[in-house]
Amino acid sequence: MSTKSIIIAGILCTMILSSCALGKKEQKDEKVFKSFITTDNGWKKYEGNPVLGGPEMGTCFDVNVIEEGGAKYNMYFSWRPQKSIALSRSDDGVNWSEPVIVLHENPDSGWEEIINRSTTVYWNGQYHMWYTGQVMRIQCSRIGYAVSDDGINFRRVTQEPVLVPERVYEGLSVMNPYVLRDDEKGVFRMWYCSGECYEPNVICYAESKDGIHWEKSPYNPVFYKGEEGAWDGDRVGGCEVHRLPDGRFIMFYIGYYDIDTARIGAAISDDGITNWKRLAANPLVEPTQGSWDGDACYKPSVYLDAQNGRWMLWYNGRCGAPEYIGLATHEGLDLGETE
């Protein structure tokens, strides 16, 4: 793309995002769902997107939404200008509180000059957070561990990373952790990404009894890119895994057509580790041309609203450089067959 084209595209994106930000501000007090933009596979983007972020806040990305903590929805997200992880809360998934930083970067550690891409689990009376620490000048990423009694004030359990790249397929980076607590097995289950630091290449799996010492799966990597030329044919990353009512596991993930073009898809596995099968309806959420997410739709965070029979999916979208948070929903719990 020519420099002139890039400048024009940037101006258009700024105009679009300014309009979206104004629309979001006007609806803040309404606390209701407006209309949605519908896709062919049943997923609908909220028309008031983005629901969090704007030019003043700067880039917000890689969200993780959980229920516990005094509000129905608690969104932990990466706040790029602050190099930190922040929390925003909401009663409806649309209108979010002003963010507060819950964990700052720690340049003195030598491995977390910036921190981002976190996952939080409420278990045994505490909030357990695993997060990505990065040193971009040497293109490396590690995973750290922190805990909190209130979900806001986190303290590091150890000053050292709890997961580091060791295998060939991990390259210089392990990042994007997503953790579930399995009380039956008495372990934490982690899905994480590895490979390159800018955008990872594959998805891997590990287990831990204490959240500090992790055993990586012999089946790693457990999830690869799609076929050449497919919507996710360049690489995969940024996943969340949920247990379905029938006992199977569903993974929502980022699929990359190329390094700059990303969409969101899903796959299903019986054990959450092996034999992942992509949904036939993929991609589930993709960029809307000319909109605030016109270049890429990244890292999904998903809530299964069984009471109302729907899925809620938050993601970070990009048009040009800035990234903000949007919402998509799917009425009905059935997401279709696998390929």
Residue spans of the language-model regions?
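Bacterial N-terminal signal peptides that target proteins for export
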Residues: M1-I7
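Carbohydrate-active catalytic/glycan-binding domains of CAZyme proteins
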Residues: C20-E339
